[in-house]
Amino acid sequence: MARKTLRARRFFSLIFPFFFMTSVYAEQTSVSAKTVTVEAKNETFSPQHPDQYQSWKATSEQSAREDALAEDPRLVILWAGYPFSRDYNKPRGHAYAVTDVRETLRTGAPKTAEEGPLPMACWSCKSPDVARLIQQEGEDGYFHGKWARGGPEIVNDLGCADCHNTASDDFAQGKPALTLSRPYAERAMEAIGKPFDKAGRFDQQSMVCGQCHVEYYFEGKNKAVKFPWDEGMKVENMEKYYDAIAFSDWTNSLSKTPMLKAQHPEYETWSAGIHGKNNVTCIDCHMPKVQNAEGKLYTDHKIGNPFDNFAQTCANCHTQDKASLQKVVAERKQAIHDLKIKVEDQLVHAHFEAKAAWDAGATDAEMKPILNDIRHAQWRWDLAIASHGIHMHAPEEGLRMLGSAMDKAADARTKLARLLATKGITHEIPLPDISTKEKAQKAIGLNMQQINAEKQDFLKTVVPQWEDQARKNGLLSQ
């Protein structure tokens, strides 16, 4: 089908939330009579937009959990000393956004609003309650404090008010009324020359997704969300930005390297690929127009794999049949995976070799250039693999980043071999058994029995209290 047909289909689109955000725990405050409070309860909009709501609700069917650490135990070593070494699952349906952030071992087991390892910002891509709290408290108020503070407030899953101005006349009239509900995302788009209010319809469709499906970090004392785009969106640009401000997410507990952890940079990688360059948006592929029982077109909010709706997605532009395109995508995915594993093997060795160098008496000055190579290698690897769809969005860029990561890791290991030789160590540094997730976690000193027990107690005692309080405050419908 011709490109203009796709554009015609877009014109009639009703866009709902693609990417979703976080929330905070704070007391509900009164608002000015001139201010309409963000409505975070998604079911409120079901009577007005029944097809969109029901398809959004169907994301609960995407319930399978895939344990990425069990699939690839090397990750435990690469993230040693960071919460991701405890628990990392592949993404599932957006209906599980709040559930998953509560249940992941990464958020710990806080007993009070002041406890826990993570800041409030960790809610920011999980719920329309985030937009509500930012409106009520301001950004500084929202970001203040620990993650547990948001428990009784952030209770509705990613939904309508994350991407739509649900209080607007346009939305009431059935128009998309797209909006950036996160002020920090609006500032980031302006930093790359894309102010939302001046963007075209198709740009806006991807920008609302880009509120969450991006790389970000926590800035300053308040741990506020910021996108590292001041120098640009390529991996080297963001690396330069982070290096200039001497930022690190954590220090690897084996190598003592100040590390960067990539998040989920789909907007950046999509922008670098052929679809992004031709303005084929996230919506075109993941939220196509479909017909309801009466033959009326609406935007499918069951965000998913384009191949599941091939006739409404890929076939709008491509002349190849489904099997042919699936074969191409599978080959690209395998190529990315194969190089990914090779880079990980080099990085695992580098972390243990760096530990051996420290143990042998290496100095900070001797280790600094080596740790910088490890930092840059793992950052480039991580930005490539953290975007789970890079084999589709930008396979060439993915391979380029992984190739660069391999070079940096090789540089680090060459320097380590020379340094270790000066310490009288010329044999290969042995690796512990990391053939399973459990063995790898034991190798870095994690007491997973205790961590899991504490989490289960938290889920049984604290989370029910959060939900009871939310119901009393009218934040949950049931």
Swiss-Prot record:
Which Pfam family, any one, appears in the UniProt record? Cytochrom_C552
Which Gene3D superfamilies does UniProt cross-reference here? Butyryl-CoA Dehydrogenase, subunit A, domain 3 (1.20.140.10), Flavocytochrome C3, Chain A (1.10.1130.10)
Its GO biological process annotations read: anaerobic electron transport chain; nitrate assimilation
User: Which residues are recorded as binding Ca(2+)?
Assistant: 215-216, 261, 263
Q: What is its EC number?
A: 1.7.2.2
| Protein residues bound to heme c 3 | 94, 209, 212-213
The record's top EC class is oxidoreductase
Pathway listed for it is: Nitrogen metabolism; nitrate reduction (assimilation)
CDD domains attached to this UniProt entry:
NrfA-like
Q: Where does heme c 4 bind?
A: 282, 285-286, 393
Cofactor notes = Binds 1 Ca(2+) ion per monomer. Binds 5 heme c groups covalently per monomer.
Which positions does UniProt annotate for heme c 5 binding?
275, 314, 317-318
Compartmental location: Periplasm
**What keywords tag this UniProt record?**
Calcium, Electron transport, Heme, Iron, Metal-binding, Oxidoreductase, Periplasm, Signal, Transport
Among PANTHER family, the record links this protein to:
CYTOCHROME C-552 (PTHR30633:SF0), CYTOCHROME C-552 RESPIRATORY NITRITE REDUCTASE (PTHR30633)
Q: What does this protein do?
A: Catalyzes the reduction of nitrite to ammonia, consuming six electrons in the process.
Similarity remark: Belongs to the cytochrome c-552 family.
**Protein's UniProt name:** Cytochrome c-552
Organism for this UniProt entry:
Salmonella arizonae (strain ATCC BAA-731 / CDC346-86 / RSK2980)
Gene name of the encoded protein = nrfA
